Amino acid sequence: MTTLGTPLSPSATRVLLLGSGELGKEVAIELQRFGVEVIAADRYANAPAMQVAHRSHVLDMLDPAALRVLIASERPHVIVPEIEAIHTETLVALEREQGQKVIPAARAARLTMDREGIRRLAAETLGLPTSPYRFVDTAADYREAIAAVGLPCVVKPVMSSSGKGQSTLRSEADIDAAWEYAQTGGRAGAGRCIVEGFIDFDYEITLLTVRHAGGTSYCDPIGHWQQDGDYRESWQPQPMSAAALRRSQEIAKAITDDLGGWGLFGVELFVKGDEVWFSEVSPRPHDTGLVTLVSQELSEFALHARAILGLPVGAEDGGVIGQSGPSASCALLAHGNGVPVFDNVADALRDPNTALRLFGKPRVDGHRRVGVTLARADSIDAAREKARVAAAALGIQLTA
């Protein structure tokens, strides 16, 4: 797609975002830089990407009839899934029946919507190294799986995001509570889970991998720290051995080649020395990749937009996207109930090498990521500290 129209005109190039959170918002902004007409959809009103889109729709994207009505009415040239909670079989059918373009492809969206499809592809079809695992449907199966993989282990709903429903079990005392949480924390309600054996890794990385018209290119590895299964900090580049980096790129290429299509993938990997294990892959920008808003000339969102549109991404096949030096991000979390209001914004931005993104989340109920601080410095440690200091300076209030 190298010819682009004018938005809100008969020539418009229309892109439909299925999912309108903070990552979708940045994708929408990058698409609009190329004059793309952006339509944003999600299950709730005033989602972040809706605030910058040309039009928006609220619907249950797990409802196949509602999804078909939306797509028929908007007639998008491209559909870009931005979350997992979508009736992906509808996308597969529309791709087959009508040639509807889905990013990166309808099969990739279907396989990656839950952990079972992608884990079986990686481990059983492609033979990639992974942690030991079992899929379970009942409490009895769950206990058998724990006995098989051993403690410590991790349990996750097959369909969840941002750490919801995920627990690390370190002793038998954790077993019952972890199962209960997994049954209430998944996007599709109670049901199937994965029990994963624990890998004694040195660190985790996200290897952002771009499939584009010119081939496959990679961003420098992103290190990250999680708490309660959710991203708290990320930094780029993560130091690692040449052998581990090479193996990481090989694994990322294998899984993304099989999924196919154009777009950016977030490939999550465990690393210990020169050894690398596949963990998960998302066929879209990744939350840990928010650091690329300051660490790269082309952020993960700009890369995704360019790849979607068939445009050059600034690197050749097998090449690495340009990086600006040690950079870090720190997530901003709000706790409680209400509409977020931010104080001391000037203090958070006092250092000239810091930046701030407030996502525009319409409401917080419980706890929610509402923004991110970003920083560059002479070292990763210094960049992380700057991002933390900026985050600590910001006040977050919740109003009724």
Swiss-Prot record:
SUPFAM superfamilies (alphabetical): Glutathione synthetase ATP-binding domain-like (SSF56059), PreATP-grasp domain (SSF52440), Rudiment single hybrid motif (SSF51246)
Gene3D superfamilies assigned: 3.40.50.20, ATP-grasp fold, A domain, ATP-grasp fold, B domain
Pfam families: ATP-grasp, PurT_C, RS_preATP-grasp-like
Superkingdom of origin organism: Bacteria
Binding site for ATP: R115, K156, S161, S162, G163, K164, G165, Q166, E196, G197, F198, I199, E204
InterPro entries hit by this protein: ATP-grasp, ATP-grasp_carboxylate-amine, ATP_grasp_subdomain_1, PreATP-grasp_dom_sf, PurT, PurT/PurK_preATP-grasp, PurT_C, Rudment_hybrid_motif
Pathway: Purine metabolism; IMP biosynthesis via de novo pathway; N(2)-formyl-N(1)-(5-phospho-D-ribosyl)glycinamide from N(1)-(5-phospho-D-ribosyl)glycinamide (formate route): step 1/1
GO cellular component, as recorded: cytosol
Catalysis performed (reactions): N(1)-(5-phospho-beta-D-ribosyl)glycinamide + formate + ATP = N(2)-formyl-N(1)-(5-phospho-beta-D-ribosyl)glycinamide + ADP + phosphate + H(+)
Residues involved in Mg(2+) binding: E268, E280
Single biological process term from Gene Ontology: 'de novo' IMP biosynthetic process
GO molecular function ontology, one term from the record: phosphoribosylglycinamide formyltransferase activity
Enzyme Commission number(s) of this protein: 6.3.1.21
Protein residues bound to N(1)-(5-phospho-beta-D-ribosyl)glycinamide: E22, L23, E82, D287, K361, R368, R369
Similarity annotation: Belongs to the PurK/PurT family.
Quaternary organization: Homodimer.
Name used for this protein in its record: Formate-dependent phosphoribosylglycinamide formyltransferase
Lineage of the species this protein comes from: Bacteria, Pseudomonadati, Pseudomonadota, Gammaproteobacteria, Lysobacterales
